[in-house]
């Protein structure tokens, strides 16, 4: 009976180690988020940009100004990055809308996180597809 328990415990340990492998390798993909030398970590919250494939210049200009002023370590989008119905259920138009919003982030090599809102998939492009993009 003890041998069976030991074998089962070893098997569970092996499964646990294998299941943690993707997390370990994913951690190498992006730089670690960490506090700076002053113990600070700045997060810029961006909510409800609701942009379309023809980006609103004012929205992009405001985002760029805030990024430059705040110098964040992380940008968090709180949903409704795009106005789904305005993209016409088109993957291409959805990608253009996302490009417009994410370009200022990419230009500054900032890390970001996304929370989806109700408008993000109303255009017929799933949240899963948007995450892959």
Where are the model-predicted features located?
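Bacterial N-terminal signal peptides that target proteins for export
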Residues: 1-11
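Hydrophobic core
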Residues: 12-20
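Sec-dependent signal peptide cleavage junction
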Residues: 20-29
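Long, low-complexity, largely intrinsically disordered segments
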Residues: 30-40, 101
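Active-site-proximal beta-strand elements of phosphoester/diester hydrolases
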Residues: 40-50
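Short, solvent-exposed loop/turn elements at domain surfaces
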Residues: 51-55
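Core catalytic region of metal-dependent phosphoesterases/phosphodiesterases
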Residues: 57-133
């Amino acid at each position: 009976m003890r041998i069976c328990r030991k074998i089962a415990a070893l098997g569970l340990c092996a499964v646990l180690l294998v299941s943690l492998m993707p997390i370990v390798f994913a951690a190498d993909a992006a730089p670690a988020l960490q506090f700076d030398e002053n113990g600070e970590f700045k997060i810029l919250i961006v909510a409800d940009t609701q942009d379309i494939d023809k980006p609103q210049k004012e929205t992009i200009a405001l985002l760029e100004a805030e990024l430059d002023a705040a110098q964040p370590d992380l940008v968090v989008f709180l949903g409704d990055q795009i106005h789904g119905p305005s993209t016409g259920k088109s993957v291409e138009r959805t990608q253009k809308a996302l490009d417009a919003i994410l370009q200022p982030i990419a230009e500054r090599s900032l890390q970001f996180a996304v929370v989806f809102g109700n408008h993000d998939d109303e255009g017929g492009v799933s949240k899963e597809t948007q995450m892959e993009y």
